[in-house]
Amino acid sequence: MARLEVDILTLFPRMCAGYLGESILGKAQEAGLLAATITDIRDHATGKHRVCDDAPYGGGAGMVMKPEPLVEAIEAARARLPGAWVVLTSPRGARLDQALARRFAEHGRLILACGRYEGVDERVMTAVDMQVSIGDFVLTGGELAALCVVDAAARLVPGVLGNAASADAESFAGVEGLLEHPQYTRPPEFRGMKVPEVLLSGDHRRIERWRRREALRATRERRPDLFARLSLPESDLRLIEAGDDEL
Protein backbone atom coordinates (compact mmCIF):
# COMPACT_ATOMS: atom_id res chain seq x y z
CA MET A 1 0.00 0.00 0.00
CA ALA A 2 1.41 3.37 -1.04
CA ARG A 3 1.73 5.97 1.68
CA LEU A 4 3.55 9.20 2.43
CA GLU A 5 5.91 9.44 5.39
CA VAL A 6 6.97 12.90 6.51
CA ASP A 7 8.97 14.36 9.37
CA ILE A 8 8.61 18.10 9.90
CA LEU A 9 11.54 19.72 11.71
CA THR A 10 10.41 22.94 13.37
CA LEU A 11 10.97 25.25 16.31
CA PHE A 12 7.20 25.51 16.77
CA PRO A 13 5.62 22.02 16.70
CA ARG A 14 2.16 23.19 17.74
CA MET A 15 1.89 25.28 14.58
CA CYS A 16 1.85 22.08 12.53
CA ALA A 17 0.04 19.61 14.78
CA GLY A 18 -3.42 21.14 14.50
CA TYR A 19 -3.47 21.32 10.72
CA LEU A 20 -2.14 17.79 10.23
CA GLY A 21 -4.77 16.33 12.54
CA GLU A 22 -7.81 17.73 10.75
CA SER A 23 -9.91 16.90 7.69
CA ILE A 24 -8.37 14.85 4.88
CA LEU A 25 -4.88 14.75 6.38
CA GLY A 26 -6.20 13.56 9.73
CA LYS A 27 -8.24 10.82 8.06
CA ALA A 28 -5.25 9.85 5.93
CA GLN A 29 -3.22 9.30 9.08
CA GLU A 30 -5.99 7.22 10.63
CA ALA A 31 -6.06 5.08 7.48
CA GLY A 32 -2.28 4.63 7.48
CA LEU A 33 -1.86 6.50 4.19
CA LEU A 34 0.03 9.37 5.80
CA ALA A 35 2.55 9.04 8.63
CA ALA A 36 3.40 12.51 9.92
CA THR A 37 5.98 13.14 12.63
CA ILE A 38 6.75 16.57 14.05
CA THR A 39 10.23 17.06 15.52
CA ASP A 40 11.17 19.97 17.76
CA ILE A 41 14.55 21.21 16.57
CA ARG A 42 15.24 22.39 20.12
CA ASP A 43 15.48 18.75 21.19
CA HIS A 44 18.85 18.76 19.40
CA ALA A 45 20.09 22.02 20.94
CA THR A 46 22.44 22.17 23.91
CA GLY A 47 22.55 24.34 26.99
CA LYS A 48 19.96 25.31 29.55
CA HIS A 49 17.98 27.49 27.17
CA ARG A 50 18.36 25.27 24.06
CA VAL A 51 19.24 28.27 21.89
CA CYS A 52 18.88 27.66 18.14
CA ASP A 53 19.74 31.10 16.74
CA ASP A 54 22.58 33.61 16.89
CA ALA A 55 23.63 36.95 15.41
CA PRO A 56 24.87 36.90 11.80
CA TYR A 57 28.57 37.20 11.07
CA GLY A 58 29.28 40.47 9.31
CA GLY A 59 26.45 42.23 11.09
CA GLY A 60 22.94 42.93 9.95
CA ALA A 61 19.41 42.77 11.23
CA GLY A 62 17.80 39.72 12.79
CA MET A 63 19.09 36.35 13.85
CA VAL A 64 20.24 33.27 11.94
CA MET A 65 19.42 29.64 12.73
CA LYS A 66 22.49 27.84 14.05
CA PRO A 67 23.75 24.85 12.06
CA GLU A 68 24.29 22.34 14.88
CA PRO A 69 20.70 21.75 16.08
CA LEU A 70 19.19 21.67 12.61
CA VAL A 71 21.82 19.41 11.06
CA GLU A 72 21.58 17.01 14.00
CA ALA A 73 17.79 17.00 13.69
CA ILE A 74 18.14 16.21 9.99
CA GLU A 75 20.58 13.38 10.67
CA ALA A 76 18.29 11.86 13.28
CA ALA A 77 15.35 12.10 10.89
CA ARG A 78 17.38 10.42 8.12
CA ALA A 79 18.03 7.53 10.49
CA ARG A 80 14.28 7.18 11.08
CA LEU A 81 13.38 7.57 7.41
CA PRO A 82 16.11 5.99 5.26
CA GLY A 83 16.06 7.30 1.71
CA ALA A 84 13.95 10.35 2.54
CA TRP A 85 14.52 13.59 0.65
CA VAL A 86 15.49 16.46 2.92
CA VAL A 87 13.64 19.59 1.83
CA LEU A 88 14.32 23.03 3.30
CA THR A 89 11.44 25.48 2.93
CA SER A 90 12.98 28.74 1.75
CA PRO A 91 12.11 31.68 -0.54
CA ARG A 92 15.38 30.84 -2.30
CA GLY A 93 14.06 27.46 -3.35
CA ALA A 94 12.44 26.02 -6.45
CA ARG A 95 8.76 26.88 -6.79
CA LEU A 96 6.38 24.20 -5.53
CA ASP A 97 3.99 23.13 -8.27
CA GLN A 98 1.76 20.16 -8.99
CA ALA A 99 4.51 18.27 -10.80
CA LEU A 100 6.87 18.60 -7.83
CA ALA A 101 4.09 17.62 -5.43
CA ARG A 102 3.57 14.47 -7.47
CA ARG A 103 7.29 13.68 -7.33
CA PHE A 104 7.15 14.00 -3.55
CA ALA A 105 4.11 11.74 -3.34
CA GLU A 106 5.72 9.11 -5.55
CA HIS A 107 8.99 9.19 -3.61
CA GLY A 108 7.03 8.60 -0.41
CA ARG A 109 9.47 9.90 2.22
CA LEU A 110 10.17 13.53 3.07
CA ILE A 111 12.00 15.40 5.80
CA LEU A 112 10.84 19.01 5.82
CA ALA A 113 13.14 21.47 7.57
CA CYS A 114 11.46 24.76 8.49
CA GLY A 115 13.59 27.87 8.51
CA ARG A 116 13.04 30.81 10.88
CA TYR A 117 14.37 34.28 11.66
CA GLU A 118 16.51 35.89 8.93
CA GLY A 119 17.47 32.52 7.50
CA VAL A 120 19.51 29.39 8.05
CA ASP A 121 23.29 29.08 8.36
CA GLU A 122 24.51 28.24 4.85
CA ARG A 123 26.45 25.23 6.14
CA VAL A 124 23.14 23.47 6.74
CA MET A 125 22.79 23.15 2.96
CA THR A 126 25.31 20.30 2.97
CA ALA A 127 22.64 18.21 4.74
CA VAL A 128 19.78 19.29 2.45
CA ASP A 129 18.71 17.70 -0.85
CA MET A 130 16.66 20.62 -2.15
CA GLN A 131 15.08 23.92 -1.22
CA VAL A 132 11.43 24.62 -1.98
CA SER A 133 9.46 27.87 -2.06
CA ILE A 134 5.70 28.38 -2.25
CA GLY A 135 5.98 31.80 -3.89
CA ASP A 136 7.86 35.04 -4.33
CA PHE A 137 7.15 36.39 -0.86
CA VAL A 138 8.63 36.00 2.62
CA LEU A 139 6.89 34.39 5.60
CA THR A 140 7.80 34.53 9.28
CA GLY A 141 8.87 30.89 9.11
CA GLY A 142 8.79 27.80 6.95
CA GLU A 143 5.99 25.96 8.74
CA LEU A 144 3.19 27.12 6.44
CA ALA A 145 5.26 26.17 3.41
CA ALA A 146 5.99 22.73 4.89
CA LEU A 147 2.28 22.16 5.48
CA CYS A 148 1.60 23.16 1.87
CA VAL A 149 4.08 20.52 0.71
CA VAL A 150 2.50 17.83 2.88
CA ASP A 151 -1.04 18.73 1.84
CA ALA A 152 -0.23 18.91 -1.88
CA ALA A 153 1.69 15.61 -1.85
CA ALA A 154 -0.59 13.65 0.48
CA ARG A 155 -3.73 14.22 -1.59
CA LEU A 156 -1.95 12.53 -4.52
CA VAL A 157 -1.39 9.31 -2.56
CA PRO A 158 -3.91 6.70 -3.79
CA GLY A 159 -6.80 6.39 -1.35
CA VAL A 160 -6.33 9.71 0.44
CA LEU A 161 -9.12 11.43 -1.49
CA GLY A 162 -12.52 9.79 -1.30
CA ASN A 163 -12.92 10.01 -5.06
CA ALA A 164 -9.82 8.91 -6.95
CA ALA A 165 -10.83 11.15 -9.86
CA SER A 166 -10.78 14.30 -7.72
CA ALA A 167 -7.03 14.88 -7.94
CA ASP A 168 -7.04 14.25 -11.69
CA ALA A 169 -9.70 16.90 -12.29
CA GLU A 170 -8.20 19.69 -10.19
CA SER A 171 -6.26 22.72 -11.33
CA PHE A 172 -2.78 21.92 -12.71
CA ALA A 173 -3.55 18.19 -12.86
CA GLY A 174 -2.69 16.23 -15.98
CA VAL A 175 -0.18 16.95 -18.70
CA GLU A 176 -1.65 20.31 -19.75
CA GLY A 177 -1.89 21.88 -16.33
CA LEU A 178 -5.12 23.81 -16.96
CA LEU A 179 -6.89 25.62 -14.16
CA GLU A 180 -9.97 23.81 -12.95
CA HIS A 181 -13.43 24.65 -14.30
CA PRO A 182 -15.97 26.40 -12.01
CA GLN A 183 -17.92 24.25 -9.55
CA TYR A 184 -21.57 24.56 -8.48
CA THR A 185 -23.84 22.81 -5.98
CA ARG A 186 -27.37 23.27 -4.61
CA PRO A 187 -29.42 25.44 -4.66
CA PRO A 188 -29.90 25.89 -8.41
CA GLU A 189 -30.45 29.62 -7.86
CA PHE A 190 -28.84 31.85 -5.22
CA ARG A 191 -29.66 35.58 -5.01
CA GLY A 192 -30.57 35.66 -8.65
CA MET A 193 -27.47 33.76 -9.77
CA LYS A 194 -28.36 30.54 -11.57
CA VAL A 195 -26.33 27.40 -12.11
CA PRO A 196 -25.49 27.12 -15.84
CA GLU A 197 -28.27 25.26 -17.63
CA VAL A 198 -25.87 22.79 -19.20
CA LEU A 199 -24.91 21.39 -15.79
CA LEU A 200 -28.56 20.60 -15.08
CA SER A 201 -29.18 19.03 -18.48
CA GLY A 202 -27.96 15.51 -17.74
CA ASP A 203 -26.16 15.53 -21.10
CA HIS A 204 -22.72 14.28 -20.09
CA ARG A 205 -21.08 15.11 -23.41
CA ARG A 206 -22.21 18.74 -23.20
CA ILE A 207 -21.17 18.92 -19.55
CA GLU A 208 -17.65 17.69 -20.36
CA ARG A 209 -17.35 20.17 -23.22
CA TRP A 210 -18.58 22.98 -20.96
CA ARG A 211 -16.00 22.05 -18.31
CA ARG A 212 -13.25 21.91 -20.91
CA ARG A 213 -14.25 25.30 -22.29
CA GLU A 214 -14.40 26.92 -18.85
CA ALA A 215 -11.02 25.45 -17.87
CA LEU A 216 -9.48 26.86 -21.04
CA ARG A 217 -11.09 30.26 -20.49
CA ALA A 218 -10.03 30.42 -16.84
CA THR A 219 -6.45 29.56 -17.75
CA ARG A 220 -6.37 32.16 -20.54
CA GLU A 221 -7.77 34.90 -18.32
CA ARG A 222 -6.03 34.20 -15.00
CA ARG A 223 -2.80 32.46 -15.97
CA PRO A 224 -1.79 33.71 -19.41
CA ASP A 225 1.71 32.39 -18.74
CA LEU A 226 0.35 28.83 -18.56
CA PHE A 227 -1.98 29.37 -21.50
CA ALA A 228 0.88 30.60 -23.69
CA ARG A 229 2.70 27.30 -23.20
CA LEU A 230 -0.22 25.18 -24.40
CA SER A 231 -0.30 23.61 -27.85
CA LEU A 232 -4.03 23.55 -28.43
CA PRO A 233 -5.76 21.82 -31.33
CA GLU A 234 -8.08 23.83 -33.55
CA SER A 235 -11.07 22.20 -31.85
CA ASP A 236 -10.07 23.73 -28.50
CA LEU A 237 -9.57 27.16 -30.03
CA ARG A 238 -13.10 26.97 -31.43
CA LEU A 239 -14.46 25.63 -28.15
CA ILE A 240 -13.14 28.62 -26.19
CA GLU A 241 -15.30 30.95 -28.27
CA ALA A 242 -18.35 28.67 -28.42
CA GLY A 243 -21.61 29.60 -26.72
CA ASP A 244 -23.57 27.21 -24.52
CA ASP A 245 -25.94 26.41 -27.40
CA GLU A 246 -22.93 25.25 -29.47
CA LEU A 247 -21.63 22.70 -26.98
UniProtKB/Swiss-Prot annotation:
<dbReference type="GO" id="GO:0052906">
    <property type="term" value="F:tRNA (guanine(37)-N1)-methyltransferase activity"/>
</dbReference>
<dbReference type="InterPro" id="IPR016009">
    <property type="entry name" value="tRNA_MeTrfase_TRMD/TRM10"/>
</dbReference>
<comment type="subunit">
    <text>Homodimer.</text>
</comment>
<dbReference type="GO" id="GO:0002939">
    <property type="term" value="P:tRNA N1-guanine methylation"/>
</dbReference>
<dbReference type="InterPro" id="IPR002649">
    <property type="entry name" value="tRNA_m1G_MeTrfase_TrmD"/>
</dbReference>
<protein>
    <recommendedName>
        <fullName>tRNA (guanine-N(1)-)-methyltransferase</fullName>
        <ecNumber>2.1.1.228</ecNumber>
    </recommendedName>
</protein>
<keyword id="KW-0819">tRNA processing</keyword>
<keyword id="KW-0963">Cytoplasm</keyword>
<keyword id="KW-0949">S-adenosyl-L-methionine</keyword>
<keyword id="KW-0489">Methyltransferase</keyword>
<dbReference type="InterPro" id="IPR029028">
    <property type="entry name" value="Alpha/beta_knot_MTases"/>
</dbReference>
<comment type="function">
    <text>Specifically methylates guanosine-37 in various tRNAs.</text>
</comment>
<feature type="binding site">
    <location>
        <position position="115"/>
    </location>
    <ligand>
        <name>S-adenosyl-L-methionine</name>
    </ligand>
</feature>
<comment type="similarity">
    <text>Belongs to the RNA methyltransferase TrmD family.</text>
</comment>
<keyword id="KW-0808">Transferase</keyword>
<feature type="binding site">
    <location>
        <begin position="134"/>
        <end position="139"/>
    </location>
    <ligand>
        <name>S-adenosyl-L-methionine</name>
    </ligand>
</feature>
<dbReference type="InterPro" id="IPR023148">
    <property type="entry name" value="tRNA_m1G_MeTrfase_C_sf"/>
</dbReference>
<dbReference type="Pfam" id="PF01746">
    <property type="entry name" value="tRNA_m1G_MT"/>
</dbReference>
<dbReference type="InterPro" id="IPR029026">
    <property type="entry name" value="tRNA_m1G_MTases_N"/>
</dbReference>
<dbReference type="GO" id="GO:0005829">
    <property type="term" value="C:cytosol"/>
</dbReference>
